[in-house]
């Protein structure tokens, strides 16, 4: 008779942190939201493209709010209730994504803008004439 070999299963550690950091990267074409715990491990992430928006609709504020609510619901299920928000970029989904996080039930303790500004760095692209 052949003995059956047991499969070893590794249990993942549950999230112990109740605080997190939300990074919102709002570009002109998309909005990407990443939620990490205090040690820097990614808990959940979302973008307007993942929520089903394509093309120009990804750049809309409604798409940013939907993506923020999706990411916030995932991290609330894992036990993160409070978060600091770090916003980067000049896209249209900056403010509505913060509102989406609050609507999903995430308590926001701090909002900080970390958009980088050039000190006359690279040359800007040629302006479009329509």
Swiss-Prot record:
Primary location: plastid
GO biological process: translation
S-S bonds: none
Sorted UniProt keywords: Chloroplast, Plastid, Ribonucleoprotein, Ribosomal protein, RNA-binding, rRNA-binding
Keyword Nucleotide-binding among UniProt keywords: no
Keyword rRNA-binding annotated: yes
GO terms for cellular component: chloroplast; ribonucleoprotein complex; ribosome
Gene Ontology molecular-function annotations: rRNA binding; structural constituent of ribosome
Entry's localization field: Plastid, Chloroplast
Subunit structure: Part of the 30S ribosomal subunit.
Family stated for the protein in its record: Belongs to the universal ribosomal protein uS11 family.
NCBIfam families in alphabetical order: PRK05309.1 (NF003698)
Name of the protein in its database record: Small ribosomal subunit protein uS11c
UniProt source species: Bigelowiella natans
